Amino acid sequence: MEKAYDPSKYEPTIRQLWEDNKSFALGSNNPDETKPPFTNIMPPPNANGSLHAGHLMYVTEDIMTRYARMQGRPTLWQPGTDHAGTETQFVFEKKLAAEGTSRHDLGQETFYSEVWDFVESQKGPIVEQMKLMGFSADWDKLKYTLDDDVVDVVLDTFQELLADGHIYRGNRIINWD
């Protein structure tokens, strides 16, 4: 018997088994449809760097999701990633500064294009980190906050709320953040 557990020996095989069997997909636990569904939308991590200690909150969500599955409830933990506009711009501008350039040197269109490419390059590693941690989200349903279908739903919802008078303009103090 080995003196210490070496996760790299076992966990890739276990993870592959989970993925091959779609173990975390909605309906994978043969749920009792008479029980109330459990749906949890993952607060999307920002696609501008690695996960950090703050992302440990996902452990709590994972526990709740696994518990709902064990109860036989129809269960979905919806994963996603976010572009985090302002923060991503800050991170990307620091990267540019380290390379001796700035967004002003690039021009607006080139800067926008390069930030978009940067975000695209960061989404994969973040999702991979979450999978390595064993989070039981339905990875086939991964969403990005700027996916066309997500943007369409947000715009439709905004227009509906505006038309119903739930969104309005006025001179009011707002809690922004």
Q: PLM features: residue spans?
A:
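N-terminal, positively charged nucleic-acid-binding surface of large information/translation enzymes
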Residues: M1-D177
